[in-house]
C-alpha cells in the first residue's frame, strides 16, 4: 500500500465519530467502504462502518491473518445484576479510594445473589482492576480476563501460585511458590527444603522459614529447632515465632519449665476454714539459653530498669498453657492482678491466651477482668488500665459470646464500659445486636450533656457504620438519632452521627439495589 492509499484510511475519522455518537457525528465521507454500508439506522450504520474500516485499517498494517480472527464470545457466568445495582457500582467506582469498602460490599452482595456487573461496566472495572477488592475476582474476574484477551492484554494474576518449582525466581516468588507447596503437601515441602536450605542466602532462608507456618505441625519441630542456631538473625527470629505454636516441642517444654520456675502458687489453710492462695514470683535472669529462644530485654526495658520483668513477661507469653495446669485459669489470673508484678504476669498470661485462644482461659480472662473493674477482686483498684484489660479480654471470645456480654452491659447502662469495649470486638455485628446498640445510642443521646460528651470523646461512633447490620431499620434508626440531636450539640458528636447515618444509608441502599423489584438506582449516596 503506497502513501496515497494510506492517507485514504478512514479508520481515524470513523473512530472519532464513534466517540462522538451517531447523532452528533458529521456525515461520513464518501468512499468505497462506506458505499457498502446498507443499514438505515444511524447507530447500526456507524457500527458497520467501524467494522469495515477496522478490517481495512488492520490489513494496511501488514498484520498476519490471525489479527483478523474473530474474538471468543463473552462467557455467560451468571445473570446481570439489576440496573439499580449497576448504576450504584459505577458511582462507587468514580468515587475513588474512599468508597473501597462499599465496592467490596457491593461485590459480596453480587456473589450472594449470583449476579454480575453488565457488560457496559467492564471498561470501568478494567481500569481499576489492580485496586479491586478480592471479592471482585469471584464475581467479575472471568469477564475481565475475557476483556483483557480481547484487547490483546494478558489476563490478571489470579493469586494462585504454581508450586511445581519453588527453586527459581525472586525471594517473594520463591516464598509464594513454597507456601503453595506446603499447602498442598507439608511433609514433601519440608523434605525438599532441608537438603538445600543451608546453601541459600539469609533473606531467602528467612522467607522460607516463615512459609513453614502453612501446614505447621510437630513434624517441623526438629528443623525449626535447628534454625535457632542459624547464623542469620532473621532466620532465628522466624523459628522463634513458630515454635511456640507447637505445644509438644522441646522449645515449649523449655518455656514451660521456665514459667513454672518463675511462678508458683502457695496455698495455706486458714484456722477457721478455707484456703488462702499467694502468687510467688521469681524473676528470671538473663542467659544465653534465653537469648537462643528469643527471650531478651528490649531497649526500653534496659533503660527503664525493667529487664527481669520483661524477661518474665516474654517467657509467660511463649509458654504453653499446660504449664499452669496445677490450678484453674481463674486462680492464676486473679492472683496475677493482685500481685506486685501484675503487669508482666497478667500480660504474659494474656499473650499466651491470645496465641492459643483456649476457651477456658479466654472466659476466665473476661470474667476476672470484669470483676476487677467492678471492685470485686481484693487489692485491685478500678482504673482505666483495668478497663482496657477487660476490653482486650472480651475480644478473645467468639463473636456471639462477645455480643451477648456487651448486650448485657448495654442493658445495665454501663456507658463507659460499652464505649471502651466497642473499640474492639467483631468486624461485623449481627442484626439483633445492631438494633440493641442503636437503641442504646438513642438513649444516651437523649441524656444529659455530660453523657453526650462522653459518647463523643473516643470517636467510636464514627467507626460503627462499617460494623452495624446494613439494613433499612438500622439506617432509619441512625437517621432518627441524628434528627433528635439537640441543636446546640457540639460538632464532634454531630459529625460522627452524620457519618454513621450516611454510611448506613448507603449500605442499606446497596442491599435494596439487588432486590429484583428495584428498577432505578440513584446516586451512590442513596
Model-found features: residue ranges?
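Long, acidic/serine-threonine-rich intrinsically disordered regions with weak helical/coil propensity
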Residues: 2-168, 296-526
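Core register positions within helices of long alpha-helical scaffolds
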Residues: 106-109, 180, 211, 242, ...
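Alpha-solenoid HEAT/Armadillo-like helical repeat scaffolds in large eukaryotic proteins
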Residues: 164-166, 180, 192-200, 211, ...
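Surface-exposed, low-hydrophobicity interaction/linker segments
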Residues: 166-170, 174, 179-184, 190
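Short inter-helical turns and helix N-cap capping residues of alpha-solenoid HEAT/ARM repeat scaffolds
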Residues: 169-170, 185, 200-204, 216-217, ...
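Conserved hydrophobic register position within alpha-solenoid helical repeats
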Residues: 177, 208-209, 238-243
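A short structural micro-motif
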Residues: 214-218, 245-246
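Long alpha-helical HEAT/HEAT-like repeat alpha-solenoid scaffolds in very large eukaryotic proteins
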Residues: 229-326
Amino acid at each position: 500500500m503506497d502513501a496515497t492509499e494510506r492517507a485514504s484510511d478512514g479508520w481515524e475519522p470513523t473512530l472519532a465519530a464513534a466517540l462522538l455518537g451517531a447523532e452528533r457525528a458529521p456525515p461520513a465521507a464518501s468512499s468505497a467502504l462506506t458505499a457498502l454500508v446498507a443499514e438505515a439506522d444511524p447507530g447500526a450504520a456507524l457500527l458497520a462502518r467501524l467494522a469495515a474500516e477496522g478490517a481495512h485499517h488492520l490489513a494496511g498494517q501488514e498484520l498476519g491473518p490471525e489479527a483478523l480472527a474473530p474474538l471468543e464470545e463473552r462467557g455467560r457466568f451468571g445473570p446481570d445484576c439489576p440496573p439499580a445495582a449497576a448504576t450504584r457500582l459505577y458511582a462507587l467506582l468514580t468515587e475513588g479510594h474512599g468508597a473501597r469498602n462499599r465496592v467490596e460490599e457491593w461485590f459480596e452482595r453480587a456473589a450472594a445473589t449470583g449476579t454480575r456487573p453488565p457488560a457496559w461496566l467492564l471498561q470501568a472495572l478494567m481500569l481499576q482492576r489492580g485496586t479491586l477488592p478480592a471479592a471482585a475476582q469471584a464475581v467479575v474476574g472471568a469477564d475481565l480476563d475475557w476483556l483483557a484477551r480481547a484487547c490483546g492484554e494478558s489476563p490478571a494474576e489470579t493469586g494462585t501460585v504454581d508450586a511445581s518449582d519453588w527453586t527459581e525466581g525472586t525471594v517473594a516468588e520463591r516464598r509464594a511458590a513454597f507456601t503453595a507447596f506446603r499447602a498442598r503437601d507439608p511433609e514433601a515441602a519440608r523434605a525438599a527444603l532441608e537438603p538445600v536450605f543451608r546453601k541459600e542466602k539469609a533473606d531467602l532462608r528467612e522467607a522460607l522459614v516463615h512459609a513453614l507456618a502453612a501446614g505447621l505441625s510437630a513434624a517441623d519441630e526438629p528443623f525449626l529447632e535447628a534454625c535457632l542456631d542459624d547464623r542469620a538473625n532473621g532466620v532465628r527470629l522466624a523459628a522463634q515465632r513458630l515454635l511456640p505454636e507447637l505445644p509438644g516441642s522441646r522449645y515449649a517444654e523449655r518455656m514451660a519449665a521456665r514459667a513454672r520456675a518463675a511462678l508458683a502458687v502457695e496455698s495455706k489453710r486458714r484456722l477457721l476454714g478455707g484456703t488462702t492462695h499467694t502468687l510467688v514470683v521469681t524473676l528470671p535472669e538473663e542467659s544465653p539459653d534465653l537469648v537462643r529462644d528469643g527471650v531478651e530485654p528490649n531497649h526500653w526495658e534496659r533503660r527503664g530498669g525493667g529487664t527481669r520483668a520483661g524477661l518474665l513477661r516474654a517467657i509467660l507469653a511463649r509458654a504453653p498453657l499446660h504449664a499452669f495446669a496445677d490450678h484453674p485459669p481463674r486462680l492464676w489470673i486473679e492472683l496475677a492482678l493482685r500481685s506486685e508484678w501484675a503487669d508482666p504476669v497478667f500480660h504474659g498470661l494474656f499473650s499466651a491466651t491470645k496465641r492459643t485462644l483456649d476457651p477456658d482461659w479466654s472466659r476466665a480472662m473476661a470474667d476476672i477482668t470484669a470483676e476487677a473493674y467492678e471492685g470485686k477482686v481484693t487489692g485491685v483498684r478500678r482504673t482505666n488500665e483495668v478497663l482496657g484489660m477487660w476490653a482486650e479480654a472480651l475480644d478473645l471470645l467468639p463473636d456471639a459470646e462477645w455480643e451477648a456480654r456487651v448486650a448485657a452491659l448495654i442493658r445495665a447502662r454501663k456507658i463507659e464500659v460499652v464505649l471502651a469495649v466497642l473499640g474492639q470486638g467483631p468486624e461485623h455485628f449481627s442484626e439483633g445486636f445492631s438494633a440493641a446498640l442503636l437503641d442504646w445510642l438513642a438513649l444516651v443521646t437523649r441524656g444529659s450533656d455530660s453523657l453526650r460528651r462522653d459518647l463523643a470523646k473516643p470517636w467510636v461512633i464514627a467507626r460503627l457504620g462499617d460494623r452495624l447490620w446494613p439494613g433499612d431499620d438500622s439506617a432509619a434508626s441512625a437517621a432518627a438519632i441524628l434528627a433528635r440531636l439537640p441543636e446546640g450539640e457540639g460538632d464532634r458528636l454531630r459529625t460522627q452521627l452524620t457519618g454513621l447515618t450516611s454510611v448506613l444509608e448507603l449500605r442499606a441502599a446497596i442491599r435494596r439495589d439487588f432486590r429484583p423489584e428495584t428498577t432505578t438506582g440513584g446516586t451512590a449516596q442513596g
